[in-house]
Amino acid sequence: MGKQNSKLRPEVLQDLREHTEFTDHELQEWYKGFLKDCPTGHLTVDEFKKIYANFFPYGDASKFAEHVFRTFDTNSDGTIDFREFIIALSVTSRGKLEQKLKWAFSMYDLDGNGYISRSEMLEIVQAIYKMVSSVMKMPEDESTPEKRTDKIFRQMDTNNDGKLSLEEFIKGAKSDPSIVRLLQCDPSSASQF
């Protein structure tokens, strides 16, 4: 039964080639793996949280996974299909810095109004701390989610209006690599964003 759908149709492959940084072979391999883990072709938030928890065994990744799921689920239907999954994976793993920052911005912008408020930033940072704080030693000025959020806003909110625009977010991250580390909660950078 699973055999009949284990290859992407040519028109789907072409669409994904145009919207990702993956080769045809990589797309086919990812698709096979996706169908193996998600035989229905759709991933629910609970399934996604279980998968995400495997990557963060020493913390509670469920809240952060919900935010990542929401950002992957671009059509807001409550599931992630292969196209949504592979496009987001391409951006987060192979995208240029600006693409990654736009993706991260959309995750932090919880209400989708085009700005990140302090409370939105705090909610994401709290979720990150729940996920990794048991295995990461934080500097004193970042020892709580509130301190980290304040630090990010001090550095990024250049017009002091209490919210971050996409432009402030990208400019702040590009001008100071430590901001990217603050956002990622990953001192070695690169991997998670």
Swiss-Prot record:
It is found in: Membrane. Residues 41-58, 60-95, 96-131, 144-179 form the EF-hand domain. PROSITE patterns: EF_HAND_1, EF_HAND_2. It is a lipid-anchor. Ca(2+) 3 binds at D157, N159, D161, K163, E168. Belongs to the recoverin family. This is Hippocalcin-like protein 1. It comes from Rattus norvegicus. The gene is Hpcal1.
